[in-house]
Amino acid sequence: MNYPPSAELNDPFVGFLEGMGHNPQASLDFFDASTKADGKDLDNWDYLVAKGDNARAWPPGDDGTPLGHDALGHALESATIGIPYDSDATPPKHSAGSTELVNRIVGEYGKNPDRLDGSPLTDSLGNITAEYMRDVQDAVGGRIEVKTYGSNAELEALADQGQLREFLGAVGKDPDAYGAIVTSQQAVSTELINEVFHQRDTYGNVLPEELSNRVAPGAEIVGIMADSRTQAVYDDKIAADAEFNEGLATADKWAGRAIDTGLGRFPVVGDAAGWVIEDIREAVVENYTRDSSAEADMERDEFLATQRAGSASAMYDATYTAAIQAGMSEEQAKTMAGSASQQVKDSYGQGRQ
């Protein structure tokens, strides 16, 4: 299955992987199977993804990156999300097999984040992370259970060991991945906030504490994303702020998909769901976009501070709106929103540690 030994930049395996990218079940089965090579069983995962003696020697492209890694990312997207990688359809609920594969992906690249430096895989891994945002927030949260869309990827152990953080940090350096992750995080956090207000009678006097628990995981994730963006722009100089702004502007579908796959727990339907999606999109673009031309001389730490303030503002607005829609007074809504905003600032700092 290795590429032919010639001077031409080609790799016939790319076409095979692109085919897998359009066939979710075949792709999932493939990554869980093995192939006969020289009379030995060769695990397809070890051959294509893991780094070891049996790993594939990928031919480099003109830019020096592995020629087939973009196609590999498409195959992984298809296998984990359950629809062709370029489809906008609502995916099926996550299966035990797809969540197990996500766990392997996070573990592999979380242990070896340097393998994602400049990799064509990162945009696909960002899409996978956005799709599994509930699983990620469930792992990061610890104090609360975040219900997942089907089976749970069980990432908590990887979060405790630091591999989830390393994975997110490496993937978030890619502008498109950054946009997908930040947008999906805002959508899931908005859902969790709305849910707690519509169940406020259950929580009584501990409602503020429950609210803080629900906004903390998302805030920690955007803290990691801010660090990743800062490293990419200021330290590694591998991307410009304009590219990250574009990543945010083109990540709309992740707001819609996060809400579509959570509507059973979200107290809106029809046109109202469309309004929620638009609110999420606007919150992300308004609070995370940076005007590079006007702020070209902004220092690294100052930029991180503005991102922290933007994250807090986005969550303040989501909390205030949810509280008002749930029938709380304006004063109560402002108090709750202020509490959520402060929790975001605290948890954002944890994400940057």
Model-inferred region functions:
Residues 1-353:
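Non-catalytic all-alpha helical scaffold/repeat segments
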